[in-house]
Amino acid sequence: QSGNEKLELKNLLLGEVWVCSGQSNMEWRMDMLPATYPDELKTARNDDIRFMVVEKTLATAPKADVTVQRKWAAVDPSTVGNCSAVAYFYAKQLQKELKVPVGLIVTAWGGTPAQSWTSFEGLHEFPNYSKNFTENIHPIKLEDMSRKIQEGRDAFVRSLKEKAEYG
């Protein structure tokens, strides 16, 4: 409380927050596996595991924010089906071992090339990619493109951090 203003936070957890990004193996939701995990889908209940899902969005320029497809939710039978199966079981094990809340930010997109999840600088560590970029992208634009991609990634990560902090 400060003067006449009061800020009250409810249902707030402090613990681990993991960004779960990648391709179809990370995107595969629990509700896509009813025959494999029927009991888990019916009985999953853990207020210390929460997740949110980021909307799939294409962008050719940096974005200051991300759109959320599914807001923060605690794991229970009505929500667990929307969570990435890989992320859910990882969080379940992590929460059990660390005994702290675990938040999952799911930002996966099946079929995306691995390069799209790698920084521009990171790709240059692989000569075949570096040569391809150098030969196929106009050299003058390469530096500008690299900067824009990095700015976009930085803005995306900042946005995820804010979502993790403020839900």
Where are the regions a protein language model picked out?
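Cell-envelope and extracellular/periplasmic
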Residues: 1-167
